[in-house]
C-alpha cells in the first residue's frame, strides 16, 4: 500500500474481492484493464486514499449524543448530495467517540453512502464522524479529494451493481477495498475539478440567493401581517420603515380588539378560504394534455423544486391530476411536517401536481403571495403536522390547509404586498430554472471529463458562457 497517511485505517476485516465489476465511467470493482486516454491509469483507490468507515454511538446512552462533533447520517447525505457540509442533523461528542467504533475524520474526507440509500456523496467541510452506513476516504497527495467526489458522483447507477442484498442493498467492504479509479496526473485532476466546480459554485450561489429572497419575502409578510409593524409605527406617531408615503397611507394608524387580540382597525379575522379556492383545476380523460410535467410530493421541499417528471397522460401516475397555474400554492397533505410545499411563479404546458397536495388558487392574482406565505409559515406547517393522523401515512384534509387562519387586510394592502413580494418569488423561480440548467450541463460534462473522453479546451468556453 503506497499511501500511508497519518493514522491507521479501521474497516471490516475481509480482504478485497478478486472479482471485477466494471463501473460506467471511471470506477470499477477490481482492475478492468480497459483502455484509457494517454496519461491515465487504473489505480487501486486504497493505494492513494485511506479507507475508513464509521459507527453509531449507543442510543442507550444519551450522554453520548449532543456536543461538538458533527455526525453524518443518511439524511445528511441525501439532503446534500455532491456538496461539502459543515453541519449535520445530529451531533455526538468525545465520550460517544471514545465508547464506540466511530472516529473523527479530517476535513476534505470524501463519504459515500453504502447501504439503505446507496450512492450519495458528501465531503466533510470540517472534522466529523459518520455512521456505519458510509465508507470514507482520506485522500493522499496523488488524488484530489474533489476529483474523487466527482468520480463517485458519476458512478451513481453503477453502485447498484456493486451492491448486494434483497431487503436493503449494501456495498460490502470486499468490493469497496477493490475499488479502482481511472486517474490522470494530479494537475489534470485539478483542472477538471476547477471546470466542474465553476458550475457547482454558480449553482450554490443561486441556491443561496434564493434562500435570501425567500427569507426577505417571509420577513416582509411577518412584518406587515403578523407583527403589524407599519400600523404599530403609525399608532406611535412614527413613519413606517422601508416604505414610501403612498404605501404607508394604506395602513390604519390604530388597533381594535378581536377574538385574536389587537388587530389593525378595519382588518378582520378570516381564513385563506376568503382568498383562495381549493383544488379547483384537475385533469380529466376528456380534458387532459397529451403529456404532463408532474410534480409529486418528493419533487418539492420548502419551495425548492426538482425537475418535473414527464409522462404521457395515459402513462402518468394516477395521482397526476392537479392542473397547476401561475400563483398556485402547493402544500402536501401527507406528512406535512416534511415541508413539501411550493409556489408556482412560472408554468409550462401540462404542469401537473399530485392529488397529495392541497392546491390553493388565488381568487385574484394579487392575493397569491399572501396565500403562499401565510400557508407555509413555520407555525402553520407545525399546526398541520400536529393535526395529521393515520398510521403509515399521517395526513390532513385539504380543507385544513385552506382553513388556515389569517388577519385579512384591505385589498389595496394586498395589492401593494403583491407588488413587493411577487417579484421576489418570481426571481426564485427564474434562479431555480437557471440552476437546473447548469446542473444538466454539469451532469452532461461530468462523465466525459472524469473519464478523459472530453478534453478541457473543448468545454471551457461553454462553461464560461453558462455561468456568465
Give the predicted meaning of each segment.
Residues 2-4, 8-11, 15-55, 178, ...:
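Non-catalytic DNA-recognition/assembly elements of restriction-modification systems
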Residues 36, 74, 124, 139, ...:
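Hydrophobic residues in beta-strands and at strand termini
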Residues 77, 176, 300, 401, ...:
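Hydrophobic pocket-lining residues within nucleotide cofactor-binding pockets
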Residues 115-118, 126-135, 150-197, 297, ...:
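Glycine-anchored helix-breaking recognition loops at helix->coil/strand junctions
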Residues 19, 23-34, 43-62, 70, ...:
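Sequence-specific dsDNA recognition surfaces
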Residues 73-75, 89-153, 321-322, 326-380, ...:
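A short beta-sheet element
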Residues 233-237:
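Amphipathic alpha-helical hairpins/coiled-coils and adjacent low-complexity
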Amino acid at each position: 500500500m503506497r499511501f500511508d497517511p497519518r493514522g491507521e485505517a479501521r474497516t471490516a476485516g475481509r480482504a478485497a474481492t478478486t472479482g471485477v465489476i466494471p463501473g460506467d465511467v471511471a470506477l470499477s470493482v477490481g482492475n478492468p484493464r480497459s483502455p484509457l486516454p494517454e496519461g491515465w491509469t487504473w489505480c487501486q483507490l486504497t493505494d492513494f486514499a485511506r479507507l475508513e468507515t464509521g459507527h453509531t454511538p449507543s442510543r442507550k446512552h444519551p450522554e453520548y449524543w449532543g456536543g461538538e462533533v458533527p455526525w453524518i447520517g443518511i439524511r445528511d447525505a441525501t439532503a446534500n448530495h455532491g456538496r461539502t457540509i459543515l453541519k449535520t442533523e445530529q451531533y455526538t461528542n468525545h465520550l460517544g467517540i471514545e465508547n464506540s467504533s466511530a472516529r473523527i475524520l479530517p476535513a476534505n474526507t470524501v463519504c459515500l453512502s453504502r447501504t439503505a440509500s446507496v450512492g450519495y456523496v458528501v465531503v466533510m467541510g470540517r472534522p466529523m464522524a459518520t455512521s456505519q452506513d458510509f465508507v470514507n476516504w482520506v485522500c493522499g497527495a496523488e488524488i484530489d479529494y474533489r476529483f474523487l467526489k466527482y468520480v463517485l458522483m458519476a458512478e451513481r447507477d453503477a453502485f447498484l451493481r456493486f451492491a448486494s442484498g434483497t431487503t436493503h442493498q449494501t456495498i460490502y467492504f470486499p468490493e469497496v477495498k477493490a475499488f479502482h479509479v481511472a486517474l490522470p496526473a494530479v494537475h489534470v485532476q485539478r483542472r477538471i475539478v476547477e471546470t466542474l466546480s465553476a458550475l457547482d459554485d454558480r449553482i450554490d450561489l443561486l441556491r443561496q440567493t434564493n434562500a435570501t429572497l425567500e427569507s426577505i419575502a417571509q420577513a416582509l409578510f411577518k412584518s406587515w401581517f403578523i407583527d403589524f409593524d407599519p400600523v404599530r409605527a403609525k399608532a406611535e406617531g412614527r413613519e413606517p420603515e422601508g416604505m414610501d408615503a403612498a404605501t404607508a397611507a394604506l395602513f390604519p394608524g390604530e388597533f381594535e380588539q378581536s377574538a385574536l387580540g389587537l388587530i389593525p382597525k378595519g382588518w378582520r379575522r378570516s381564513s385563506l378560504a376568503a382568498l383562495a379556492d381549493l383544488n379547483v383545476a384537475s385533469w380529466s380523460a376528456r380534458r387532459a394534455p397529451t403529456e404532463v410535467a408532474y410534480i409529486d410530493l418528493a419533487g418539492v421541499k420548502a419551495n425548492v423544486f426538482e425537475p418535473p417528471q414527464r409522462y404521457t397522460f395515459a402513462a402518468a401516475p394516477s395521482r397526476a391530476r392537479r392542473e397547476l397555474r401561475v400563483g398556485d400554492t402547493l402544500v402536501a397533505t401527507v406528512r406535512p411536517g416534511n415541508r413539501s410545499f411550493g409556489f408556482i411563479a412560472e408554468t409550462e404546458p401540462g404542469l401537473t401536481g399530485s392529488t397529495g397536495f392541497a392546491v390553493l388558487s388565488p381568487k385574484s392574482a394579487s392575493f397569491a403571495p399572501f396565500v403562499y406565505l401565510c400557508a407555509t409559515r413555520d407555525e402553520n406547517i407545525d399546526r398541520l403536522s400536529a393535526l395529521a393522523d393515520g398510521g403509515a401515512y399521517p395526513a390532513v384534509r385539504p380543507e385544513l390547509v385552506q382553513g388556515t387562519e389569517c388577519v385579512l387586510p384591505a385589498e389595496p394592502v394586498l395589492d401593494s404586498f403583491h407588488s413587493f413580494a411577487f417579484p421576489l418569488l418570481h426571481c426564485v423561480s427564474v434562479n431555480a430554472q437557471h440552476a437546473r440548467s447548469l446542473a444538466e450541463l454539469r451532469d452532461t460534462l461530468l462523465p466525459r471529463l472524469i473519464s478523459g473522453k472530453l478534453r478541457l479546451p473543448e468545454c471551457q468556453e461553454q462553461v464560461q458562457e453558462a455561468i456568465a
